[in-house]
Amino acid sequence: MTDPFTSDGAKMPPKPFTIEEGRRQVRSFVLRQGRFTPAQQRTFDALWPRFGLDYLGAPRDLAATFGRDAHKVLEIGFGNGAALRFAAQQDPSRDYIGIEVHAPGVGRLLNALEEDGSTHVRLYHHDAVEVLEHEIADGALDEVRIYFPDPWHKKRHNKRRLIQPAFAQLLVRKLREGGRLHAATDWADYAEQMWDVLDATPGLVNRAGPRGHVERPTWRPQTHFETRGQKLGHGVWDLLYDRDSGIGNRESQEQLPSASG
């Protein structure tokens, strides 16, 4: 079957969403929504009722959404969906929620989920901050994954990065105690910012210790881009944080469950 989601099509103007932090607002990320071609729109319309979650702005009963009680894993900014699809294939005992603002990426994953016959994946085509603030109950998530968020590498654009103190505090609220946050980046400067923000966030404990990172976990597949970058000597930083009561010490880390999956 030909995948109609091979082109971004015409671009729509970026539309920022923000989260309050003190007196200023912090962007979560910029909406980069490509317009669908007619073929893409038909495919989207056919598959969205099966796999899509329309943003309603009200708390959602996730157990009812999936028809079962299971661990809930959220991936923010899933791109083309490769990591989310891989995780869902490898561990069908968990329920997966993906959020992505780029329309063709959502469409490609919809096609993949139909091909796999998935029943335990649901997708939002909306801003992550609004979904987290209004649709996900506090303590409802077992894990949050954020892989290779836009680095906004120009210094004047750093304020647009997703990982900011207010956003980290929001994630802590949504994770259950004992839950996990997994972030990955291939930009050294962004890794430094992630450490600055996440290591200082009450309720998060760095699995590798302060300013530490881990080897790529088995549940995150290595991308072609990542492989090419490593051949050129580029680094990749995987950061794992456990959600606890806010006591960030080595003893509390060692008592937490292992990071095997």
From Swiss-Prot:
S-adenosyl-L-methionine binds at residues 75, 100, 127, 150. InterPro entries: SAM-dependent_MTases_sf (IPR029063), tRNA_(Gua-N-7)_MeTrfase_Trmb (IPR003358), tRNA_methyltr_TrmB_bact (IPR055361). The active site is at 150. Pathway: tRNA modification; N(7)-methylguanine-tRNA biosynthesis. Its EC number is 2.1.1.33. One of its GO terms (molecular function) is tRNA (guanine(46)-N7)-methyltransferase activity. Keywords: Methyltransferase, S-adenosyl-L-methionine, Transferase, tRNA processing. Substrate binds at residues 154, 186, 223-226. CDD domains: AdoMet_MTases. GO terms for cellular component: tRNA methyltransferase complex. The keyword Oxidoreductase does not apply. Residues 156-161 are annotated as: Interaction with RNA. It catalyses: guanosine(46) in tRNA + S-adenosyl-L-methionine = N(7)-methylguanosine(46) in tRNA + S-adenosyl-L-homocysteine. The keyword Chaperone does not apply. Belongs to the class I-like SAM-binding methyltransferase superfamily. TrmB family. Catalyzes the formation of N(7)-methylguanine at position 46 (m7G46) in tRNA. This is tRNA (guanine-N(7)-)-methyltransferase. It comes from Xanthomonas axonopodis pv. citri (strain 306).
